[in-house]
């Protein structure tokens, strides 16, 4: 369906049997032999005892290696090297046992290969290389397992998103790289990804709110069984209580504010008054340039429009070949993979596409969230403002209640006049890095709408800040290849 700006917008309000297009290669996953767990300790006491026993055994072995007179012909350096090698391997194993990490057949095979390679290298190549590989066998044995996405869960996830209201991040639970943990009844779910032993939760749970507390408890138990530590990114203020009890979560998580949603109250939004003057001027400029807009469902794109929009992607400063983002982005642009996706397209006076915005829907059509805006280099000024304003107008006609434009990261750094020294340093760094991360430019755009909403938080353990920084930065900024 195609709708010109100002015509009713179809948000699939009364169409629960929406088409979900899945990649053709997706099949129901089977448990592979290499993923079979061969050692699993699910008792914390047993983990502590096992780790302590391994450390004691290592100390005893090191004492034998270092002091046994029958090996007096060994050089001191050789005894020390073997002692450190054994200690390193045992330390890796003890840490993995303490964290409750299971050992799969693949882990055992990899550890055996490391050990054999280390012994061979020690005899044939170099002592140091052999010792590193032998120590690495303990590291390979206890390497954390990972969760793998199940594309066939998309219809279930979409049904829960369609039942979730007033959560601007709910549609992004569909992102292809995310795994999902469902409640026992399947009426609620969490989206998450795993990375180097951390389970990073994306946003709030979706679905039946009454199931959220038990869902979080079940998810925490599942994480402990796999030896994963929990991190939550994009948690809303009203859901902080779900993660506040260390007895339930199994660890203490500290909330750190990272920004605020920008949500338009659609029914009451009017571009009138002095404070909207800059927005009105930007929109008016596009009218003067002869810019027009149209709205189309992504799954209903014809070949001509898809080719035109793909050309805009290729000409966009954001890049055409990669996706980025974790908590507040989808992927698969123009693929028609996800249900409920609407595109609003801007054309200049000659009919050439200059830009488009991608919106995801939730709550049976009550909520819309902007995914990613795309525009050509050199597109007329005000294109983004015009696309946002026209989508708000169309959403109002369609009965949409809330429209999320984006997420304003650290708005207090940009909006406050009085800043401390650390805040000034942070703002200066953000200003310098703006060509890469565009936080300051995004804030300048969003403040024209005067629609800052509730805060979002990242929930982390303060004892693991540096490792978590690496994990979160890799999830947000490491590019993923896009297929068009």
Curated annotation (Swiss-Prot):
Per the annotation, which location comes first and is thus the protein's main one?
Answer: membrane
Query: Per the record, what ranges lie on the membrane's Cytoplasmic side?
Result: 1-47, 101-113, 479-484
Q: State the annotated membrane topology for this chain.
A: Multi-pass membrane protein
Q: Which InterPro entries match?
A: LPG_synthase_C, PG_lysyltransferase
Question: Might you report a single GO cellular component term?
Answer: plasma membrane
Q: Where are the transmembrane segments?
A: 48-68, 80-100, 114-134, 458-478
Q: Which Pfam families match?
A: LPG_synthase_C
Q: Which cysteines are joined by disulfide bonds?
A: none
The UniProt GO MF terms for this protein read: aminoacyltransferase activity
Q: Where is this region: MprF-like?
A: 135-457
The keyword Membrane is annotated on this UniProt entry: yes
Q: Where on the tree of life does the source sit, at the highest rank? A: Bacteria
Task: List the keywords (alphabetical).
Answer: Cell inner membrane, Cell membrane, Membrane, Transmembrane, Transmembrane helix
Picking any one GO biological process from the record gives: phospholipid homeostasis
User: Residue ranges, Periplasmic compartment?
Assistant: 69-79, 135-457
Location of this chain's protein in the cell: Cell inner membrane
Additional comment: Expression in M.smegmatis increases cell resistance to human beta-defensin 2 (hBD-2) and to sodium nitrite. It also reduces the negative charge on the bacterial surface upon exposure to an acidic environment, enhances bacterial cell viability at lethal acidic pH and induces a slowdown in biofilm formation.
What does the entry's domain section say?
Answer: Unlike homologous domains of MprF and LysX that are positioned in the cytoplasm, the MprF-like domain of LysX2 is in the extracytoplasmic region.
* Functional description taken from the UniProt entry: Plays a role in mycobacterial fitness. Likely enhances survival of pathogenic strains. Considerably reduces the overall net negative charge on bacterial surface when bacteria are exposed to an acidic environment.
Q: Which family does it belong to?
A: Belongs to the LPG synthetase family.
Q: What is this protein called?
A: MprF-like domain protein Rv1619
Q: What is the lineage of its organism?
A: Bacteria, Bacillati, Actinomycetota, Actinomycetes, Mycobacteriales
